């Protein structure tokens, strides 16, 4: 599903322009991910909205995005499966052009339970999602970004790992690991 450029009529006035840029925002059919996609589109970027499970919600979010006058596409795919990530990136590139901005905002459900009610498998599932996803997404995008000598990778973090939120330990641990990985990647890749 794609949209073509139209004169944007948006509620936000931007102090910067992303005209000529293309963004991929994972988990962008609801909440923060959708707000980020809309803001990037408002600033003139072509944005690929990503979803995995709920096609109807994805299509509704994309229509909401398009109604703002922004250009983009909707792409389904898993952000924790290497071959699927490669397919997502290739599809966005063929539809919108090279990706300049990658926003990693996808998230699974985050239940609240006492520590003793979680098992290690659920902790591992959270770590797999919040560390594996940014790693695989960055690994897919870095060669492309380095080749064109431009790119931005934005990982959406959370303050929960600093605050130690109770009944949320798997998510807190995973977001702490994601934050450490992101800081290390930023130090390695900074100009």
Range-by-range predicted roles:
Residues 22, 29-30:
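Conserved glycine-rich cofactor-binding loop
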Residues 45-60:
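Conserved glycine-rich Rossmann-like NAD(P)H-binding loop of the short-chain dehydrogenase/reductase
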Residues 55, 76-88, 120:
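The beta1-alpha1 cofactor-binding region of Rossmann-like NAD(H)/NADP(H)-dependent oxidoreductases
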Residues 86, 107-124, 147, 167-170:
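Conserved mid-core segment of classical short-chain dehydrogenase/reductases
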Residues 116-135, 150, 154, 171, ...:
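Catalytic Tyr-X3-Lys loop
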Residues 138, 174, 182:
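Active-site helix of classical SDR
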Residues 143, 187-188:
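Alpha-helical segment proximal to the catalytic Tyr-Lys
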Residues 158:
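Residue(s) in the substrate-gating loop at a strand-loop-helix junction
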